[in-house]
Each structure stands twice: as C-alpha cells, then as structure tokens.
Amino acid sequence: MVPDLIRNVVGIVGNVISFGLFLSPVPTFWRIIKNKDVRDFKADQYLATLLNCMLWVFYGLPIVHPNSILVVTINGIGLVIEAVYLTIFFLFSDKKNKKKMGVVLATEALFMAAVALGVLLDAHTHQRRSLIVGILCVIFGTIMYSSPLTIMSQVVKTKSVEYMPLLLSVVSFLNGLCWTSYALIRFDIFITIPNGLGVLFALMQLILYAIYYRTTPKKPSTTGPHPRSRIRTSSYQPSPPSPRAPASSPLSARTTTSMAAMSPSISRLSHKLA
C-alpha cells in the first residue's frame, strides 16, 4: 500500500515536470505565429514526439498495461500539445514542408493502426501486449532522449553552451530521474530504460555546462544606460558679450553711408547761399 502511494506521488510530480517540458517550445511557436513563417525551424522532433506520445498512451491503456493511468495522462496531454504545435507549423509552412509533414503524419497513423491491430488481435495476454508495445516505446523513447547528443557535440566543438540552455538540461534531468524512480518502485523495465538513459544524457549536459560555461562568449549587455546617455555633452557655453560697442545693423549702416554721400552737396549749397 505504501509503495503504491509513493509511486503515485512520484508519478504526479513526473506529470508536472513533463508538462513543463512539453510547454518549453512555446516561445518558438509564438515567434512563428508573429512572423507568419517557420523560417529554418524543423518539424522533425515534434513529429517524433507525437509518435512517442501515441505509443506511450497505448502502452498505458488498461487493455495493454494495467495500473498505468499516470503514464496515459501525461502522454495524452503531450499528444494534444504536439498536435497543436504541428498544426501551427503546418499553417505557416511552404508547400514542400506541408507535403513532407502530410506524408510523415500519414505514415505514423498507419504505423499506429498496424501496431494496435496486431497487438489486440495477436497478443491475448497483458504480459505479451506489454512486451510488444513496451519494446517499441523503448526504441522510440531512446531515440528521443538521445537527440541532445548533436547539441552536446556542438558544445564540445565550439566550447560554448549558448545553444544548450541550463534550465532545460536541469528539468530534463529531474524528469528522467522522477520517471526512473516511478518505474523502479514497481519495476517496469520499459519505462526504466528510456528514462534512465534520459538521466544519463541530461547529466552529461550538466557536466558539459560546468566545463564550458566560462569559455562561452558573453553577450553584450543590454541593461546599461541608453547609448545616447553615454554621448559626452558639449562643454561649449556662450561667451559673455564683449565690452566693445555693438555692431551696427544693416539698416544703420545704410543710413550712415547715405548721410556721408549727402554731406558734399550740403556743403556746396551752403557756399552758394553765402
């Protein structure tokens, strides 16, 4: 009774952490919506996650593996979230990407239909059904958890953790640890293997982060004063007026010139009158 209670608590915590992981690409898709263009983003990982969620939902059903409701809930939520992501991606993709997505989605649907029919018609016990679907879950779960290996190799080559966010690595580690613990309380090898590998890969990311954090180029600070505020203000101040006489205006200059020109004529007129 106590192990079951602990297992349920751990499973609920795992649901919460996994939900956070499913929501982590939201900023990416918000950017796609704002730009109305997928640009260089790829839908591959979301298509893979969709298939992975479908397999785990099927695995957790009572007709396949009883007492796995917490596996069904989180992967059912993940299935809906991934479907929303792919819908957004489809709406803002070009014809080539839409065609590719359509082919992959149709293939995944046919694959799941074949798995469901094959398991339900051929395997007549929970143990055999769990074995078949569990092996498929391990294969696709391992592929998904090993996807950060490409990013890790990039970190080693560039000696920079710029494209490996610390928070995502920490949450991935906690998620794998939580679900591994869940699987060990009532031993389930099919949940243990992919999540145990997830813990290992996330731990490797954290180690790499600790090694290469100091060698990562720092981004220019955007929290300092506005660039205009750093411009040196002019020290010029108007000088006080000169004690000399003020300059004549154009009007007074013209008046003075006219008076000077008239003075000889006035002198001659005065001489005649005399």
UniProtKB/Swiss-Prot annotation:
Q: Where is the composition biased (Low complexity)?
A: 245-258
This protein's assembly is summarised as: Forms homooligomers and/or heterooligomers.
**This protein is called what?**
Putative bidirectional sugar transporter SWEET7d
Q: Which GO terms describe its biological process?
A: carbohydrate transport
Main subcellular location of this protein, as a coarse class? membrane
Region Disordered, residue ranges: 218-274
Q: Where in the cell is it found?
A: Cell membrane
What role does this protein play? Mediates both low-affinity uptake and efflux of sugar across the plasma membrane.
Q: Which Gene3D superfamilies match?
A: 1.20.1280.290
List all topological domains (Extracellular). 1-8, 67-68, 122-130, 186-188
User: Can you provide one Gene Ontology molecular function annotated for this UniProt record?
Assistant: sugar transmembrane transporter activity
- List the ranges whose topology is Cytoplasmic: 30-45, 90-100, 152-164, 210-274
The record's Gene Ontology cellular component field reads: membrane; plasma membrane
The answer, when asked if Lipid metabolism is one of the entry's keywords, is no
Q: Which InterPro entries match?
A: SWEET (IPR047664), SWEET_rpt (IPR004316)
Q: Which regions span the lipid bilayer?
A: 9-29, 46-66, 69-89, 101-121, 131-151, 165-185, 189-209
Q: How does it sit in the membrane?
A: Multi-pass membrane protein
Q: Which family does it belong to?
A: Belongs to the SWEET sugar transporter family.
Question: Keywords, A to Z?
Answer: Cell membrane, Membrane, Repeat, Sugar transport, Transmembrane, Transmembrane helix, Transport
Question: Domain MtN3/slv spans what residues?
Answer: 9-96, 132-214
Record-annotated disulphide pairs: none
